[in-house]
């Protein structure tokens, strides 16, 4: 690491606009209805494939940028054939190492997100990104930088793979604990005079549709609110504090959620994510946006929210989700979704077990999530130093590189 930083001090660097050294190409429109089942990922406006097709329109290594939606501007790197849809690809010329370009784009991911335009469905355009200037050292130096940064990302990938394995174990036991078969058995053992009820969400709670909140309304302080997009990117399973605030005037017009309400995002790029929820456990009443619902029940909210994560619930979502580019699910459909409902005492016990699983999952194998975060921060730190050509960069805290 010291050698490469010394090299960068005297490196001759040329700055060029991306449009001068890269070719930007839009994808081809396709809908899930028109796709033919296959194993080629269709890359659109999300962070992962929208669905799969039987043919590709990009071969080899491809850098893509999501063109529209909540994740417009998201940068991806593909080493397999893909079908590029609602996104654009970036192909560098011979002056640029493709992997170097990818790391540089990641370094500027927040700037790319800031290119979003549109009040409805936001878009990011290649013509705007093409104006960004990129530092171009020699190809030899680019390769050395890539080698260093890839070591960080490979290690993070290994840690994430191990964490994913633990997550699969958790998912298995969660689905088993919340299965109708298991709940029927346990309910019978606990209370001979009670049966497991299969009920609809509408029978045990009430959905309230959100309204009116836009990100442009956000303030640094004021009345607490949650926007549907934040459920995907900012919040976990539960939340007791918000990240955004609005004025008294805006807040007075919003639907409100109370402690133990479940907040459900009902618009997404894909059917897997639509319906993602967060349990509000804060003491304050909060406002919430359109494209989401609150769900209020006298049952254990966390029990119901855990059930929202199961494969059984996912199948119900798939039957009712609508849309192609933007997937939606409606409150009147969710009211009809079925859920196995044991006595409240058993709900509480199951939640207690699953909460412990969650803690173990986040604390497993030498505090994996914390180590992943630490390595990711290391990667971001040295990416900043290596790709902005900061000659004063630190040479400390580099281990096992």
Predicted regions and their residues:
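Charged, alpha-helix-forming regions
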Residues: 1-401
């Amino acid at each position: 690491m010291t050698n490469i930083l010394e090299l960068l001090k005297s490196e001759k660097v040329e700055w060029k606009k991306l449009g001068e050294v890269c070719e930007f190409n839009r994808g081809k429109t396709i809908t899930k209805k028109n796709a033919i089942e296959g194993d080629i990922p269709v890359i659109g406006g999300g962070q992962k494939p929208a669905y799969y097709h039987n043919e590709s329109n990009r071969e080899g290594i491809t850098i893509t940028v999501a063109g529209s939606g909540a994740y417009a501007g998201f940068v991806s790197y593909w080493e397999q054939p893909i079908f590029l849809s609602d996104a654009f690809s970036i192909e560098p010329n011979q002056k640029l190492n493709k992997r170097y370009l990818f790391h540089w784009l990641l370094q500027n991911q927040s700037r790319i997100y800031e290119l979003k335009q549109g009040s409805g469905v936001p878009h990011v355009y290649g013509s705007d990104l093409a104006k960004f200037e990129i530092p171009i050292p020699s190809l030899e130096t680019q390769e050395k930088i890539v080698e260093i940064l890839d070591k960080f990302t490979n290690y993070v990938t290994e840690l994430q793979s191990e964490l994913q394995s633990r997550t699969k174990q958790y998912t298995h036991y969660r689905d088993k604990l919340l299965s109708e078969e298991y709940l029927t058995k346990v309910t019978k053992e606990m209370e001979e005079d009670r049966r497991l009820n299969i009920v609809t969400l509408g029978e045990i709670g009430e959905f309230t549709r959100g309204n009116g909140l836009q990100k442009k309304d956000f303030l640094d302080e004021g009345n607490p609110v949650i926007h549907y997009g934040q459920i995907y990117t900012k919040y976990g399973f539960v939340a007791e504090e918000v990240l955004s605030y609005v004025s008294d005037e805006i807040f007075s017009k919003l639907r409100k959620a109370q402690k133990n309400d479940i907040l459900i995002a009902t618009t997404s790029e894909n059917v897997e994510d639509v319906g993602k929820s967060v349990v509000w456990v804060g003491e304050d009443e909060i406002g919430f946006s359109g494209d989401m619902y609150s769900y209020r029940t006298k049952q254990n909210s966390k029990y119901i929210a855990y059930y929202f994560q199961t494969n059984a619930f996912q199948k119900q979502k798939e039957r009712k989700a609508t849309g192609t580019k933007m997937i939606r699910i409606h409150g009147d459909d969710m009211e009809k979704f079925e859920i196995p409902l044991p006595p409240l005492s058993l709900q509480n016990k199951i939640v207690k077990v699953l909460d412990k699983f969650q803690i173990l999952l986040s604390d497993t194998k030498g505090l994996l999530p914390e180590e992943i975060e630490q390595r990711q921060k290391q990667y971001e730190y040295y990416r900043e130093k290596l790709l902005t050509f900061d000659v004063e960069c630190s040479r400390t805290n580099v281990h096992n590189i």
